[in-house]
């Protein structure tokens, strides 16, 4: 029993060091359980304030009045005291609170928290959970693997020596074959076979062992409380037998989970554990029945390796795990799948039969080597045409190789090949898939270009057509499809040795233009036959070009006849209204009178005033100009036709100005000084002035107008152009006029008056400086033309006489040489 005096002394010492009467945060103290001394038991000096007479101390606990009855506060000493014995197993800790309160309940000091711990004493005896333990032990159990766990408890404080339990085997009955067949873990109470007991267990068939076991507290100390129990162990035969492989059909239609095998561990306290490699839908129940929980798919996993373990409650294996092989049996549940391939295959046209164009293959996920994965190929399309003896494609049913048949293919064709892949070796019940590939027949340059027309023309061209003119356009065609194979080249093969013609075309064009390169000549060649050939730029495959690769262009050269042209584009003259019938007004002539003969006619002589001579082109008044008024104009159209070629014609207008009849005779002005013009014609003329010397005429207002006299020869040979309001310009109309002296009549109009000038012009040959060269008279002593001719004729007669004598002599000499020898007379020698 512990005396209270030392505790009081201890608490007094603590209190001596307390200088402040303030509550501490929390006070902790320890009180031994089962205290056997006097009570009250002084536990702790509380830090109560001095002068606490004004209030009273209040003690409260966490269990209301029960704790208050167990503890109290000595008001005189200020100690916390225990009023009775404490039992740790009843309560190990008390939470107390001390306050100083006034009469009206007001807290003057506190609260002060105090925790009282009850110190444990070894006053509890260990107890087994059972007085007798029974267990079954299977042969083949590994040594050291617990097959039974003994359980015991101690009411003392956990974690202390008072509750630190140790297990021991006190005895084994029977002790055969070895007295230490078993081992017991002293800390855990795990009962297992000892290594020596494991080897001897097979000799103890159906034996029962009884063990006397003890549990003691205070750990390994010799002192302490203890308890005893009995363990009865039955030895049973080992039923942990190997398993045969299990074959399961894939996609098996049964109720799941479906049992496939069973294991059994004959020992007690067994827990079965299942492992699958790879993980699969398998489990095992508490009875050791193995199940598959769902349908299996051989293509996903064809085989599983299962391990079944028999374990104790702590997950330790009693024996080596059992292996179970699960083989998934194949079913024909997978159709062939076409292997990836290029969806389009290009094959050149003209490829020989037997050329492989594609190899279609399929894969079947069913078991390799089984009928379920035995694939046979069948050609679905294109189907051969009815009545056709040849096929475009051939198919190897085993390899899926597609080759060209004997039926020809054409460039540009797009053919969809459909091949059926059937498993079960092509059986009707087999699964199938359709493999497709598009065959594109590519073009080769096997067609030579050809002209659409091999004969063109005849094309008529005038010989004066200018170089560069288009002669003909030749169209060609090429049956090939590839643009590069349709590119053409053109050339002139024959018929143009002089290079008169040329070809032009665009690089990608299918037509060529035959153009003129040089001038044509009717005299040199009135016709041409030009042969043009067309060919491919790319190399031709197969037969060469045929006859249609050439085209012949026939060209006819047309002689050019110069168009009709009059010496003037229009004719104009002025006549008085009093001009009598039959008067010559003017003459219409061709520009080149010596080249052709014309026939003239009037087209629109509405008044019938005029007439024209058909051959000479002279225009006369057909009747009096009745109705004509001065100042009026009268226009007619003259048509000229070629006498030899009536189809050639031309026309010109004739404008007649009517003048007022002069009441007085026409005033003839004296000619001025002589003037000359050069022939052939040069670019200058004679200025004619219209200003009259008559003051009455000269003083009138208005411009002067000029016209040649009505003589046709004058109008043919001369041309008069106005120079200004008072002068005109006279030039030669013809390129050549016979040299001589000419009086050119010029009619002048001024206001209402008219008069005529006689302009004297000398036409002569001129030197390079434009100066007139005049004829000189015959010089004395010079021979005349007649004498010169006589001398020439006499000379020629003399030469002719001499030549006659020479030729006569030569003829006689040749005759003498031709006589035979016997005809020559003998000459006597003298």
From Swiss-Prot:
It comes from Mus musculus. Residues 668-788 are annotated as: Ectodomain G. The keyword Transmembrane helix applies. Keywords: Calcium, Cell adhesion, Cell membrane, Glycoprotein, Membrane, Metal-binding, Phosphoprotein, Repeat, Signal, Transmembrane, Transmembrane helix. Three calcium ions are usually bound at the interface of each cadherin domain and rigidify the connections, imparting a strong curvature to the full-length ectodomain. PANTHER family: CADHERIN-16 ISOFORM X3, CADHERIN-23. It holds the Pfam family Cadherin. The chain crosses the membrane at residues 789-809. Cadherins are calcium-dependent cell adhesion proteins. They preferentially interact with themselves in a homophilic manner in connecting cells; cadherins may thus contribute to the sorting of heterogeneous cell types. GO terms for cellular component: basolateral plasma membrane; plasma membrane. CDD domains: Cadherin_repeat. GO terms for biological process: calcium-dependent cell-cell adhesion via plasma membrane cell adhesion molecules; homophilic cell adhesion via plasma membrane adhesion molecules. The gene is Cdh16. Residues 27-128, 133-237, 244-338, 343-451, 457-566, 571-667 form the Cadherin domain. Glycans are attached at residues 519, 604, 724. Residues 1-21 form the signal peptide. It is found in: Cell membrane. The keyword Secreted does not apply. The modification Phosphoserine is found at residue 823. Residues 22-788 are extracellular. It is a single-pass type I membrane protein. PROSITE patterns: CADHERIN_1 (PS00232), CADHERIN_2 (PS50268). This is Cadherin-16. SUPFAM superfamilies: Cadherin-like (SSF49313). Kidney specific. GO terms for molecular function: calcium ion binding. InterPro entries: Cadherin, Cadherin-like_dom, Cadherin-like_sf.
């Amino acid at each position: 029993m512990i005396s209270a005096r030392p505790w009081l002394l201890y608490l007094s010492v603590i209190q001596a060091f307390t200088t402040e009467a303030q509550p501490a945060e929390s006070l902790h103290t320890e009180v031994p359980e089962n205290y056997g001394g006097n009570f009250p038991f002084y536990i702790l000096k509380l830090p109560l304030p001095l002068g606490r007479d004004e209030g009273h101390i209040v003690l409260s606990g966490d269990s209301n009045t029960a704790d208050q009855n167990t503890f109290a506060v000595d008001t005189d000493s200020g100690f916390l005291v225990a009023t009775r014995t404490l039992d740790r197993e009843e309560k190990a800790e008390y939470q107390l609170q001390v306050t100083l309160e006034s009469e009206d309940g007001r807290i003057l000091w506190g609260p002060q928290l105090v925790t009282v711990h009850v110190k444990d004493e070894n006053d509890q005896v260990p107890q087994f959970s059972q007085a007798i333990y029974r267990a079954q032990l299977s042969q083949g159990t590994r040594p050291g693997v617990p097959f039974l766990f003994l359980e015991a408890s101690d009411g003392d404080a956990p974690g202390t020596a008072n509750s630190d339990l140790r297990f021991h085997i006190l005895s084994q009955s029977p002790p055969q074959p070895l007295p230490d067949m078993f081992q017991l873990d002293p800390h855990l109470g795990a009962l297992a076979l000892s290594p020596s007991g494991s080897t001897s267990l097979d000799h103890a068939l159906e034996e029962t062992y009884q063990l006397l076991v003890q549990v003691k507290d205070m750990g390994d100390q010799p002192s302490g409380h203890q308890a005893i129990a009995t363990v009865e162990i039955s030895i049973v035969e080992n039923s942990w037998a190997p398993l045969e492989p299990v074959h399961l059909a894939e996609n098996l239609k049964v109720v799941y989970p479906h049992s496939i095998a069973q294991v059994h561990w004959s020992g007690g306290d067994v827990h079965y554990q299942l492992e699958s490699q790879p993980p699969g839908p398998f489990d095992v129940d508490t009875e050791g029945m193995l199940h598959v929980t769902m349908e299996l798919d051989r293509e996903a996993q064809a085989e599983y390796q299962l391990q079944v373990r028999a374990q104790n409650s702590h997950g330790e294996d009693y024996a080596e795990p059992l292996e179970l092989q699960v083989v998934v049996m194949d079913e024909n549940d997978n159709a062939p799948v076409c292997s990836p391939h290029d969806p389009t295959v290009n094959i050149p046209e003209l490829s020989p039969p037997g050329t492989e164009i594609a190899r279609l293959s399929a894969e079947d996920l069913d078991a390799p080597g089984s009928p379920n994965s035995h694939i046979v190929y069948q050609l679905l399309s294109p189907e051969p045409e009815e009545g056709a003896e040849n096929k475009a494609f051939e198919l190897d049913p085993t390899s899926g190789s597609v080759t060209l048949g004997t039926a020809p293919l054409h460039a540009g064709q797009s053919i969809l090949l459909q091949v059926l892949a059937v498993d079960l070796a092509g059986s009707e019940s087999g699964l199938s898939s359709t493999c497709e590939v598009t065959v594109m027949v590519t073009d080769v340059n096997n067609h030579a270009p050809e002209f659409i027309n091999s004969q063109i023309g005849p094309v008529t061209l005038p010989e004066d057509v200018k170089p560069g003119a288009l002669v003909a356009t030749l169209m060609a065609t090429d049956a090939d499809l590839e643009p590069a194979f349709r590119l053409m080249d053109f050339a002139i093969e024959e018929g143009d040795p002089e290079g008169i013609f040329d070809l032009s075309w665009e690089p990608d064009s299918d037509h060529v233009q035959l153009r003129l390169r040089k001038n044509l000549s009717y005299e040199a060649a009135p016709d041409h036959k030009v042969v043009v050939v067309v060919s491919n730029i790319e190399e031709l495959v197969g037969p060469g070009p045929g006859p249609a690769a050439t085209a012949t262009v026939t060209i006819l050269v047309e002689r050019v006849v110069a168009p009709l042209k009059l010496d003037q584009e229009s004719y104009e003259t002025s006549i008085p209204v009093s001009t009598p019938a039959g008067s010559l007004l003017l003459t219409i002539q061709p520009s080149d009178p010596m080249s052709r003969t014309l026939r003239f006619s009037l087209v629109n002589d509405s008044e019938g005033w005029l007439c024209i001579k058909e051959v000479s082109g002279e225009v006369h008044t057909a009747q009096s100009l009745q109705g004509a008024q001065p100042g009026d104009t009268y226009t007619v159209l003259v048509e000229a036709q070629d006498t030899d070629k009536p189809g050639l014609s031309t026309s010109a207008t004739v404008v007649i100005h009517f003048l007022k009849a002069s009441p007085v005779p026409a005033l003839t002005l004296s000619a001025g000084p002589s003037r000359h013009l050069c022939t052939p014609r040069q670019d200058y003329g004679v200025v004619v002035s219209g200003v009259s010397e008559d003051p009455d005429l000269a003083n009138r207002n208005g411009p002067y107008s000029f016209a040649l006299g009505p003589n046709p020869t004058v109008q043919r040979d001369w041309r008069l152009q106005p120079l200004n309001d008072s002068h005109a310009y006279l030039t030669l109309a013809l390129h050549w006029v016979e040299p001589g002296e000419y009086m050119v009549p010029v009619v002048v109009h001024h206001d209402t008056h008219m008069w005529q000038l006689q302009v004297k012009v000398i036409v002569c040959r001129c030197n390079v400086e434009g100066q007139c060269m005049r004829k000189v008279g015959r010089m004395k002593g010079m021979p005349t033309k007649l004498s010169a001719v006589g001398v020439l004729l006499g000379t020629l007669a003399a030469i002719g006489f001499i030549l006659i004598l020479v030729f006569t002599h030569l003829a006689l000499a040749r005759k003498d040489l031709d006589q035979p020898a016997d005809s020559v007379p003998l000459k006597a020698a003298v």
